[in-house]
């Protein structure tokens, strides 16, 4: 299905914003802003202004004033007198600056992908005067399967084939829309996926002076807040260890467009080599995931379709 779309239109291999993770990337697509500027600097982060960790998966956190910055495209459309229908797109289920799309659907894993396709088909096959000008929808697959089984697993291939069949159904049915010839379709992703293994694991706790560590924000990238006088020493240790890159947040390479948010980034940012897992624990823990993202966005494993 994607091949036929590419032949009918255009396509490109693109790389995501950094960090190459779900919510930062989706909200970047919605706002046109890098995560440093739209505020969702990772799926989970520590906000020094509030004084605690926040998560995009926490229903109360995402409703905090100022959690989301920037203006998502559905609010821009509505301000211009257009109608937006947004189905499960990250960030759409909460008011941002007091505004939301005309129609929005909170995330739920219960509706099948064919049912989700039907939501869009129904919206676009109404009488022309009732058709929304902007529709956005989100699938969590094959991402979820790739996390569990790995990007090259038979399960991931089967899930990708299932999504392809849903898209084939969607593009067949959407031709009934009275405005079909005027619709611009974009099919894209939020990031790529890299394979993980238990052997590619580094526990940072034994490497660092734990009395100098204030907090950690696990994930990819790995957030490390240390006492200021220990920062340079910690960075030297991490770089010497290998399989990772570490910077003070204000010294991140410019190409990442990352490191300037005033309250939501630790003073050291650590990006593991693609395929490696970083941890901070009293005991070594088994890497159970078989795939993840968040690595250097220029790495081809992080690239995505457009």
Question: What do these predicted ranges mean?
Answer:
Residues 216-306:
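Active-site neighborhoods of enzymes that stabilize oxyanions during catalysis
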Residues 1, 111-125, 142-183:
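A long, amphipathic alpha-helix that forms part
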Residues 12-15, 28-30, 75-76, 83-88, ...:
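Structural recognition of the beta-strand scaffold that forms the well-ordered cores
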Residues 178, 182-183, 189-229:
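Acidic/histidine-rich catalytic neighborhood
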Residues 33-151, 242, 279-280:
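His/Asp/Glu-rich, glycine-adjacent segments
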Residues 1-37:
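Short, structured active-site-proximal loop/turn typified by the sulfatase FGly-forming signature C/S-X-P-X-R
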Residues 8-10, 79-85, 129-135, 179-184, ...:
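Loop/turn elements at helix/coil->beta-strand transitions in domains of secreted/extracellular proteins
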């Amino acid at each position: 299905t994607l091949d036929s779309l590419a032949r009918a239109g255009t396509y490109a291999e693109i790389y995501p914003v950094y960090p190459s993770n779900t919510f930062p990337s989706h909200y970047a697509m919605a706002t046109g802003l890098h995560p440093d500027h739209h505020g969702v600097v990772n799926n989970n982060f520590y906000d020094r202004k509030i004084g605690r960790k926040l998560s995009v998966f926490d229903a109360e956190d995402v409703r905090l004033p100022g959690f989301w910055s920037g203006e998502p495209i559905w609010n821009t459309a509505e301000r211009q007198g257009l109608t937006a229908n947004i189905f499960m797109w990250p960030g759409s289920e909460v008011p941002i600056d007091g505004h939301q799309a005309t129609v929005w659907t909170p995330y739920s894993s219960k509706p099948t992908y064919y049912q989700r396709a039907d939501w869009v088909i129904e919206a676009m096959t109404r009488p022309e005067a009732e058709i929304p000008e902007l529709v956005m929808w989100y699938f969590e697959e094959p991402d979820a399967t790739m996390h569990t089984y790995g990007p090259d697993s038979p399960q991931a291939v089967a899930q990708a084939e299932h999504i392809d069949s849903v898209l084939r159904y969607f593009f067949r049915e959407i031709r009934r829309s009275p405005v079909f010839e005027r619709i611009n379709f974009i099919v894209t992703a939020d990031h790529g996926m890299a394979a993980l293994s238990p052997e590619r694991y580094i526990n940072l706790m034994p490497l660092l002076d734990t009395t100098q560590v204030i907090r950690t924000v696990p994930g990819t990238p790995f957030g490390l807040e240390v006492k200021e006088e220990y920062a340079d020493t910690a960075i030297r240790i991490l770089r010497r260890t290998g399989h990772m890159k570490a910077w003070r947040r204000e010294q991140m390479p410019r190409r990442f467009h990352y490191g300037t948010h005033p309250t939501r980034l630790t003073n050291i940012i650590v990006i593991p080599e693609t395929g490696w897992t970083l941890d901070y624990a009293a005991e070594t823990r088994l890497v159970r995931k078989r795939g993840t993202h968040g690595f250097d966005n220029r790495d081809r494993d992080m690239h995505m379709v457009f």
